[in-house]
Amino acid sequence: MKKTITASLLLLSSLGLHAQSGTNSPYSQYGLGELSEQSGSFSRGMNGLAYGLRLNNQVNALNPASYSALDSLSFIFDAGVSLQMTQFKEGGRSISARNADLEYVVAGLRLFRHVGVSFGLLPYTNVGYDYSNSAHINGSLSPESPTATYNNKYSGSQGLHQVYLGVGAEPLRNLSVGVNASYLWGGYTKYVTNTYSDAYVNTLQRTYTAEVRSYKLDFGLQYTQPLSAKDQVTLGLTYSLGHSLNADPELSVIKNNSQLAVADTTRFRISNALDLPHTFGVGAVYSHNGQLMVGAD
């Protein structure tokens, strides 16, 4: 009980630490952002292998059916921190980016015989980017200069976070099923700003925002087929329910002309424009004596 309370307090304290984005990539500007791996330390050591992974000393949140394998004598707590170093190149130019983030906090324990539970905090998507481009254009409204320079700046932040509670059971020998029930929250703020060196040309700023408060359901199944006394194969299947997030994204367009001292703001809103897709996963893991594993998802 004391271990469970301690892990719960650590999970709650990590909610504030997880407020910032865990990426620095222009690809995160699309949709709800870049999808997070959501895998634990052992799974990442096997390049993200998860759907058929079934261990008694590891929490595998990507397939809740695996919770039924948790050891009855141990309480598992796992937390991860990531450091991202990326280099982007385009048109002979390059830029480096570094990002550090609290990746996940998960815990798991056996509740009854062949029944295990897990809870934790995971990132679902990450939004984080900041880049710009500029060029010269012919023609200008200003009588002082026949040419002008424009600059387009793109930036965004936030993402979606996920806190979950899951249970896995083995109702039949070698067959396990499980479910994760999650609460999703977060959103995004994205900016596109067009500025010109010519003060007579309008500066245009577009701000895209959305706030999400919704749920997520993930189902899992695992079947283990013994091959010998030391060898076995585990097949894993997962399904995540797709549904509307009931979110209303907004676009705010601000036109500003410093020379004429004129500003104008227009706002647009689209109802129920964001959805979670239906997702499916399948994987298999071959294990020899609990020491050698080979698998694919």
Locations of the language-model features?
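Residue-level detector of alpha-helical transmembrane segments in integral membrane proteins
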Residues: A7, N57, I270-S271
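Hydrophobic alpha-helical membrane-insertion segments
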Residues: L11-L12, R54, S72, T189
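Single-residue recognition of alpha-helix boundary sites
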Residues: S13-S14, S74, L184
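Outer-membrane beta-barrel porins/channels
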Residues: Q20-R44, R110-D297
